[in-house]
Amino acid sequence: MHLAQLRQPLTRAAANSCHSVCRLPTTHSSVSATAILSEQFAHLRIGPSSSNVAVEGRRYASVKAQGAYRLKPKRTIPKKLGAKKTGDQYVIPGNIIYKQRGTLWHPGENTIMGRDHTIHAAVAGYVKYYRDPQLHPDRQYIGVVFNRNDKLPYPKDAPRKRKLGLVAVPRKVEEVEKPTMSASGLPLFVTRHETIEIPPPAVTTPAAAGKAVKGQGARVSASGAAAVPASSSTISASASSNSNNGGSSVIAELIKEKLAARAEYNARQSALRKLQQQKMLARRGTRVLRLMNNYSYRETNWEIGRLIGDPGSVPGTEKVGSRKAKFRARRRRRNTFLLGIKERKLAKADRREEYRRRVREKREQRLVQRKEFLAKQREAKKAREGGAAAEKSEKKEVKAEKPAAAAPKVEKPKAPEAAKKESKPKVEEKKAAAAEPKKDSKTEKKD
């Protein structure tokens, strides 16, 4: 209640109290006077009692009841929309970062969206406003990062960052040495190797290879895999036939060198295959005997099972080489094939360009020849015209020196068209002359 409303009730109460105090007789003691004053001031107490109605005054409603300004959850007051946290500002889980109508901003890393499209922080960290073209070309996102220096978006294949409340400590891996001896002093395992003798590689010279081929002879098939023995008579016969047919002895020597190289290559490949087979057998023949509880040595069950090979394969029937080696060989063949196609295309393009170049050169050459020919023709024509003009001038000079006698005039024969034109009027005249006597005869008869 305002003081202005309490002014009149207070003045009235004070006036009544003073009036009663002034009437007090002087004969009373001080105790009775204090009691009277306390009674008078009791009337001034403001409270719910009926005696203070005049002091309280009237009450009027100034605002509406609570709940009159209640809005829907999605219809926030416009003045309260917008960003609540700026970039790089620290937030805790549940903090409102951006309040909006619709999705102007979308939730990104470590953020969530409420029912009214408000974006909240899901973890404690620093706010980042960013775009992610890989996720969406036009959307803009709000995220929260743990480290202030981090940048969003994170790389696509990067590991996800989580805050587990732990500290990254490098792991110390201590390599424990595996024991090789038992407590009783016996070795824990014994390895038995199958020894093989690897012959030293034979060094062959081209001359020795040529002699071997000349003595024994070899004929390689088209595939180059199998070598078929052939007598030296066939080689000499082929060489002699080539020489008899106009060839030279160089061709025969080239054939011999090629056959020798093929034989040497096949021998080297067969030796390599044998060595690989021996190594594989030695690897299979190696036995690892382990110490058992009864102080006996034996192979483990899984090693015994490996002796028969992998599941679904029979030992001794598989080809030498691993599965990945086959894949590498296939890839190498494919690359060689594709490289050959590319080289053929390039060669074809070069041939086409060479052909076009030759065509252009021939065209230019023909144009030059044509220009030369036309120039020669013009020169010849000018020469002929100059000779004709000289002859005419000479003739004129001769005529001027010797004037010719007057020749009799000879009538030229008329052209057939002129004769026809002259004949037409003559025919008309004849018709008119024939028609005149007929008219005269008719007139005479009438008379």
Curated annotation (Swiss-Prot):
Location of this chain's protein in the cell: Mitochondrion
Gene3D superfamilies named among the record's database cross-references: 2.40.50.100
Keyword rRNA processing: no
Primary location recorded for the protein, binned into one broad class: mitochondrion
Cell cycle keyword on record: no
Region entry Disordered, spans: 377-447
A cellular component annotation (GO) from this entry: mitochondrial large ribosomal subunit
Gene Ontology terms: biological process: translation
One Pfam family it belongs to: Ribosomal_L27
One Gene Ontology term of the molecular function aspect: structural constituent of ribosome
UniProt xrefs under InterPro entries: Ribosomal_bL27
Comp. bias intervals (Basic and acidic residues): 377-402, 409-447
Keywords attached to this entry: Mitochondrion, Ribonucleoprotein, Ribosomal protein
Subunit-level organization: Component of the mitochondrial large ribosomal subunit (mt-LSU). Mature N.crassa 74S mitochondrial ribosomes consist of a small (37S) and a large (54S) subunit. The 37S small subunit contains a 16S ribosomal RNA (16S mt-rRNA) and 32 different proteins. The 54S large subunit contains a 23S rRNA (23S mt-rRNA) and 42 different proteins.
Summary of the function given for this chain in its UniProt record: Component of the mitochondrial ribosome (mitoribosome), a dedicated translation machinery responsible for the synthesis of mitochondrial genome-encoded proteins, including at least some of the essential transmembrane subunits of the mitochondrial respiratory chain. The mitoribosomes are attached to the mitochondrial inner membrane and translation products are cotranslationally integrated into the membrane.
Similarity comment text for this entry: Belongs to the bacterial ribosomal protein bL27 family.
Protein name in UniProt: Large ribosomal subunit protein bL27m
Organism of provenance: Neurospora crassa (strain ATCC 24698 / 74-OR23-1A / CBS 708.71 / DSM 1257 / FGSC 987)
Gene field: mrp7
